[in-house]
Amino acid sequence: MADSLVRATAANGSIALVAVLTTESTKEARRRHSLSYLTTIMLSRAMSAGLLLASSMKVKQGRVTIKIQSDGPLQGLNVDAGRDGTVRGYVGNPSLELDLIKTSQGNHYFDFKKATGKGYLHVTRDIGKGEPFTSTVEIEGGGIGEDIASYLLHSEQVQSAVFVGEIIEDQEFICSGALIAQILPSAVENKTLINLLDEECKKITGFSQHLLASKDNLPSLFSHLFPNLNPKIIKTMDNNQSISFKCRCSRDRSISALKLLGKEELIEIMNEDKKSELTCNFCNEIYNVNEQELKTIIGEF
């Protein structure tokens, strides 16, 4: 199934639910950046979380940036997600791999906190005009889900549950995605409802398996996870929104960035290398500028 995002309400409209499937976007990010299993999972989770946060923005041009700055071997992470369903991202050390840890039940997991180390999660909301607004929280578990929930609680004072997950079989990514459940502003004082949501979330185990079961029918994920909350799909034009890995870079933008180096440095590049190669961090696309193009750019100063 193609990547998509769906919205619903629950508990008579008092709880907002959003789910996103990012399997194909994850595969595209992995291909472009030559990601390891560990970094594929971490970037996938961050892209999914970014799309969930962006889905609540009021303007269609709104975008959310998730950035991890820390002292661990991951060497940082950066995701840019839009209300329009586009997402892109990269990690500082794409080849990083850590040994899997085996539980007493025979399951395996990565130590995400070992990958991130100590540091901060920055979330920036940009509505396309005025100054973007950034909030910062300390990294907790490093697995993205709990860190985003911490951000929502401490920076936006929103009681939320965030689930992220993926399924890997025979070295292939079968599915990836995330879900968020939030108490709506009209019910934030309803302690009974808050406790009910908390209890329902505690019952959820193996989110990734639920995601796998719903990957061909994403709306069914809500009823699988919250049968007691009577979830109802929101029927609007942009529900069941298409999601894709899409970068906003272009050759023109790359040329504009090159001009920022200044005339003298561009002359030095032309004399020494006869060309310039620009690589987009977000999508790894390479833009080559030849000697004649460099001369033209220099002539514009």
UniProtKB/Swiss-Prot annotation:
Organism: Prochlorococcus marinus (strain SARG / CCMP1375 / SS120)
Family assignment from sequence similarity: Belongs to the HSP33 family.
Modification after translation, per record: Under oxidizing conditions two disulfide bonds are formed involving the reactive cysteines. Under reducing conditions zinc is bound to the reactive cysteines and the protein is inactive.
Listed InterPro entries: Heat_shock_Hsp33, Heat_shock_Hsp33_C, Heat_shock_Hsp33_N
Database matches in CDD domains: Hsp33
Taxonomic placement: Bacteria, Bacillati, Cyanobacteriota, Cyanophyceae, Synechococcales
Pfam families reported for this sequence: HSP33 (PF01430)
Entries under Gene3D superfamilies matching the protein: Hsp33 domain, HSP33 redox switch-like
NCBIfam families named among the record's database cross-references: PRK00114.1
UniProt KW Zinc keyword: yes
GO cellular component: cytoplasm
An example Gene Ontology biological process: protein refolding
GO molecular function, one term: protein folding chaperone
Annotated gene: hslO
Name the UniProt record assigns to this protein: 33 kDa chaperonin
Location within or outside the cell: Cytoplasm
The UniProt record lists the keyword Iron-sulfur: no
Disulfide bonds: C247-C249, C280-C283
Task of the protein: Redox regulated molecular chaperone. Protects both thermally unfolding and oxidatively damaged proteins from irreversible aggregation. Plays an important role in the bacterial defense system toward oxidative stress.
Keywords: Chaperone, Cytoplasm, Disulfide bond, Redox-active center, Zinc
